[in-house]
Amino acid sequence: MAIKPQPQWQRRLASVLLWGSTIYLLVNLLAPALFRSQPPQVPYSLFIDQVEGDKVASVYVGQNEIRYQLKPEAEDEGKEKAAEGQILRTTPIFDLELPKRLEAKGIEFAAAPPAKNSWFGTLLSWVIPPLIFVGIWSFFLNRNNNGAPGGALAFTKSKAKVYVEGDSTKVTFDDVAGVEEAKTELSEVVDFLKFPQRYTALGAKIPKGVLLVGPPGTGKTLLAKAAAGEAGVPFFIISGSEFVELFVGAGAARVRDLFEQAKKQAPCIVFIDELDAIGKSRASGAFMGGNDEREQTLNQLLTEMDGFSAAGATVIVLAATNRPETLDPALLRPGRFDRQVLVDRPDLAGRLKILEIYAKKIKLDKEVELKNIATRTPGFAGADLANLVNEAALLAARNKQDSVTEADFREAIERVVAGLEKKSRVLSDKEKKIVAYHEVGHALVGAVMPGGGQVAKISIVPRGMAALGYTLQMPTEDRFLLNESELRDQIATLLGGRAAEEIVFDSITTGAANDLQRATDLAEQMVTTYGMSKVLGPLAYDKGQQNNFLGQGMGNPRRMVSDDTAKEIDLEVKEIVEQGHNQALAILEHNRDLLEAIAEKILEKEVIEGEELHHLLGQVQAPGTLVV
């Protein structure tokens, strides 16, 4: 859907008037100088000779010019005298004797009268300066308001973009995949906009507002555009941050202007992206004082959304946020945002549908199995998958291929997950050997401990900012629940790299820093969040945060606990991590020969994957006394 063009007739009329006035002024100023004839210019010496020769009749002496008229000459004595003499001009010089010469010859002379300004020039002298001042003032006003019409009050106008139906870029529900539940909820809104009588006949009321919540990149904005495209109604889109302005009251004025425009074009949809920019709870301390600009904007939004219609037509408000926990409760009450629709990351089937949509836009090789790509991308949102397809196409173009292959997709996945290959980062032979054993340690422990997923690739090619190598584990299915045993398996797999360094080199390096951090965090969550402690029992010591789609940041705050309880938590976390470490050591000691063989092979090839890797890892044996 394209942006609806703004009417331009006012600007065109102003341009015509401006150019017409400019041309008129230029003609009046330049025409006299261009078309008025000037007397011939002569040297001052010739002028003196003519005065001495008694040929001059009269002289007008000016500051910058002397004009004089010659005496008429008689052709013959029986004929009339010729017409008046010729008028000439010359440039004066400092000559104090000139008046005496003129008087001695009896020549009439006088000072030239001062030039008189015309009525037009007088008018310009009064009009032009104020016009210049007004023009400069208008220029800076328009510059501060990005050229928007409305002059000094333009900042009170809504900055919403209006999308209308009718072009090839129209978005429908067919362009959205992986969020079937959200599509179903919005389909009801679309159906009401198309056939309102079906609902009003039963006394039903459509929700006045629908709030789309979910992680970034899951398609909330795309869903709102698709809803407007399916309904075939005008679609107003604006970001929450565009309401807030430096001027006090501008945000509230823009809210009023937005809803006034929406009422005029009803039925329509108003979409407010990033609602948390103006909808934060007033009780959270986010506002500094009762007259804060954001609070005024929120109050105006609450007022406008409290049930409004335009001549029986409907205006529906859609909004999107990834921080619903920060929104004001008054904004979420029934009658304003009646529904909250979760737009979550897609599952395997959803990822496959999204890949099929974006794969239509590129030249795909016939051998590509999109289901394999969907399986290798757990946790990817719609925007991540779109970027993945584009990265694969760019890689194919870089390699001058005719189509995009599955190898391009695998490389694109690794670029997104682990970062770019750093082939220019040269490691010493010793460091390269340490990295090789470290990554093989992860792989061998992961092959015995299935809780972390299937090992798909081992690489010692540096990637990203810090990774000197990596072991890629891919889940075989979408998982939503993990048991205690699987979490312990993940901890043991994370510590497999450090365990391999201890066994082979009898020392440890800084390469396991991230592994230790992740293992400790996971063990702490087992104790404080999931209640997986035999000593502390089924208690949660973390204050959970619901609907936190942006990640945990600094982590959930811990409840107030006694010193003894805090000590028990630390001991339990330490015991879980140490147990995982011992499991990793036992597995690698039991498979020491295989560890050496795979490490030598990866030092030669740098990358092992596919059937070769599966064959090697299939030889791993679990020790008989493995502690679980």
Swiss-Prot record:
Q: Where is the protein situated, by its record's location annotation?
A: Cellular thylakoid membrane
Cite the record's note on assembly.
Homohexamer.
What cofactor is needed? Zn(2+)
**Annotated positions binding ATP:** 214-221
Protein name stated in the entry: ATP-dependent zinc metalloprotease FtsH 4
Keyword field contains Protein transport:
no
Binding locations of Zn(2+): 438, 442, 515
Q: Which residues lie on this side of the membrane: Cytoplasmic?
A: 1-14, 141-628
Membrane-spanning ranges: 15-35, 120-140
**Highest taxon of the source?**
Bacteria
Q: Which HAMAP family match?
A: FtsH
Alphabetical list of Gene3D superfamilies matching this protein:
1.10.8.60, 3.30.720.210, P-loop containing nucleotide triphosphate hydrolases (3.40.50.300), Peptidase M41 (1.20.58.760)
Induction info: Slight induction by UV-B light.
Q: Give a yes or no for keyword Thylakoid in this entry.
A: yes
Which function does this protein serve?
Acts as a processive, ATP-dependent zinc metallopeptidase for both cytoplasmic and membrane proteins. Plays a role in the quality control of integral membrane proteins.
This protein's UniProt keywords? ATP-binding, Hydrolase, Membrane, Metal-binding, Metalloprotease, Nucleotide-binding, Protease, Thylakoid, Transmembrane, Transmembrane helix, Zinc
Query: Where would one find the signal peptide in this protein?
Result: none
* GO MF terms, alphabetically ordered: ATP binding; ATP hydrolysis activity; ATP-dependent peptidase activity; metalloendopeptidase activity; zinc ion binding
**How, per the record, is the cofactor bound?**
Binds 1 zinc ion per subunit.
- PANTHER family for this protein: ATP-DEPENDENT ZINC METALLOPROTEASE FTSH 1, CHLOROPLASTIC-RELATED, METALLOPROTEASE M41 FTSH
